[in-house]
């Protein structure tokens, strides 16, 4: 998952101008009217060779909670808690204001890394304000001009170590050699989960229910969540990092630039997650976009849990559950046996089952099987259903071993692997799922010829000529 930087500050200090410079396009509406950016806006930032996610927040305004400014302040505080670091922007020409002092105190108490930037510092007009910024107690301020691009090199030097540290800490351990160490969930390496689905399926509401806090903006409007931001917490004493992704719409409907970026970030969340929770709407499950999302998670080799939301308002629960199981089996055969859990994000019912399903599928995703057990199993499978004999030449399956975990991957050494039908490979994969209790887990199976490792495979056979035979015989006699 990419490093996330939240840009915060009073209205009209240049946050949106800086955001636009970082993303290289005008995504945030820029105006001289304070408070013109009223929501979180996210983009894929490029700064020199650095790549990260940047959030443009609403202005930090000292106002009562019932006003629009109060809502903006609460939302900004959430963005700060969700981001990896905060870029606090003040106006060097205006100097430090009362609101700057109040919110500098909020940022210090957050415990998150804060970079102080004095914007509009070009020329002599900003020098006094630049010196004044030291009084905020957030360290040495960076002198920037978002409008003219000044100070960007200094910003690169400050952000680089933060981004590199976050990248090494967050990346999910996948495609691990079977000889590697067992996966141990710790606070430094929490279980990484992505919650994905169509817009308005209830992803943010579900996460708020899980973590017990109203940390994500929710509402009836589809697409209200525009970013994929990770929240670290403990769920039943298990350290987890959960990503709430923007709703993945059909491509034809993804027209806004922001939504395109959000969907892209959602896809990255899937790639960096260990377990992907595909959230369906009970009223309209298994639309084509749902199937694409689940298929993407399987192709990326992630453990998958299917969660059906809004179960509290489903009138025909028993029949609907039966239809869901049939639909899952028919439409997603590659995820045969994946956990299917019914939940209500609104009431919290079913969360205990969801937690159990996540833990079980994660353990299965890390399954290791000894070579001895695998070869005993392979012999039984061959006896029950021998491989075909295309052209009268029977394919021999000689040996099997596990090559990796996360997801489980196996290699079968055989003769003529190119002639083995796909149906027989599916027979083996389905057998692995059933006999080793790996339902719903992506399984990788590779057929290899023993000749693949033969260094002399493509060499021409050398036939000695009569002259060479004569010379060799002569050399032998001389010896």
UniProtKB/Swiss-Prot annotation:
Assembly: Associates with the 50S ribosomal subunit.
Residues annotated for GTP 2 binding in this entry: 197-204, 244-248, 309-312
PROSITE patterns with a match to the protein in the record: G_ENGA (PS51712)
Biological role stated in the UniProt entry: GTPase that plays an essential role in the late steps of ribosome biogenesis.
Region (Disordered) location: 449-479
GO MF annotation list: GTP binding
Keywords, sorted A to Z: GTP-binding, Nucleotide-binding, Repeat, Ribosome biogenesis
Domain EngA-type G: 3-167, 191-366
Organism (species): Jannaschia sp. (strain CCS1)
NADP is among the record's keywords: no
Protein name, UniProt field: GTPase Der
């Amino acid at each position: 998952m990419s490093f996330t930087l939240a840009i915060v500050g009073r209205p009209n200090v240049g946050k949106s101008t800086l955001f636009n410079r970082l993303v290289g396009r005008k995504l945030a509406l820029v105006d001289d009217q304070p408070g013109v950016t009223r929501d979180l806006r996210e983009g894929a930032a490029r700064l020199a060779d650095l790549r990260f996610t940047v959030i443009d927040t609403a202005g930090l305004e000292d106002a009562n909670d019932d006003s629009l400014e109060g809502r903006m302040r609460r939302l900004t505080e959430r963005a700060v808690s969700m981001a990896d670091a905060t870029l606090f922007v003040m106006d060097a020409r205006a100097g430090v204001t009362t609101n700057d002092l109040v919110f500098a105190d909020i940022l210090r108490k957050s415990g998150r890394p804060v970079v102080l930037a004095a914007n509009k510092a070009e020329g002599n007009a900003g020098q006094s304000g630049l010196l004044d910024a030291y009084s905020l107690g957030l360290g040495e301020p960076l002198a920037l001009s978002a409008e003219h691009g000044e100070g960007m090199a200094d910003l690169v030097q400050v952000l680089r170590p933060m981004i590199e540290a976050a990248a090494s800490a967050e990346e999910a351990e996948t495609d691990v050699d079977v000889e590697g160490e067992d996966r141990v969930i710790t606070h430094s390496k929490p279980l990484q989960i992505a919650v994905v689905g169509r817009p308005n399926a209830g992803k943010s509401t579900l996460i708020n229910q899980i973590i017990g806090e109203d940390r994500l903006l929710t509402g009836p409007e589809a697409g209200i969540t525009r970013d994929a931001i990770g929240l670290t917490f403990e769920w039943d004493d298990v350290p987890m990092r959960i990503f709430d992704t923007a709703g993945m719409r059909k491509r034809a409907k993804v027209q806004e630039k922001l939504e395109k970026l959000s969907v892209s970030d959602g896809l990255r969340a899937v790639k960096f997650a260990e377990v992907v929770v595909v959230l369906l709407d009970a009223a309209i499950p298994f639309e084509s976009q749902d199937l694409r999302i689940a298929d993407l998670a399987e192709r990326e080799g992630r453990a998958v849990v299917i969660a059906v939301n809004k179960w509290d308002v489903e009138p025909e629960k028993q029949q609907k559950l039966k239809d869901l199981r049939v639909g899952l089996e028919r439409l997603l055969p590659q995820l045969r046996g994946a956990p299917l859990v019914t939940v209500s994000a609104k009431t919290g019912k079913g969360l205990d089952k969801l937690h159990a399903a996540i833990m079980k599928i994660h353990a299965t995703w890390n399954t290791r099987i000894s070579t001895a057990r695998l070869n005993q199993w392979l012999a039984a499978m061959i006896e029950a259903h021998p491989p075909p004999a295309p052209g009268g030449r029977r394919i021999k399956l000689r040996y099997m071993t596990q090559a990796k975990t996360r997801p489980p991957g196996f290699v079968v050494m055989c003769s003529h692997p190119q002639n083995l039908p796909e149906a027989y490979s599916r027979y083996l994969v389905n057998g692995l799922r059933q006999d080793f209790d790996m339902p719903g887990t992506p399984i990788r199976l590779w057929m290899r010829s023993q000749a693949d490792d033969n260094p002399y495979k493509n060499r021409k056979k050398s036939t000695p000529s009569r002259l060479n035979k004569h010379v060799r015989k002569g050399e032998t006699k001389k010896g």
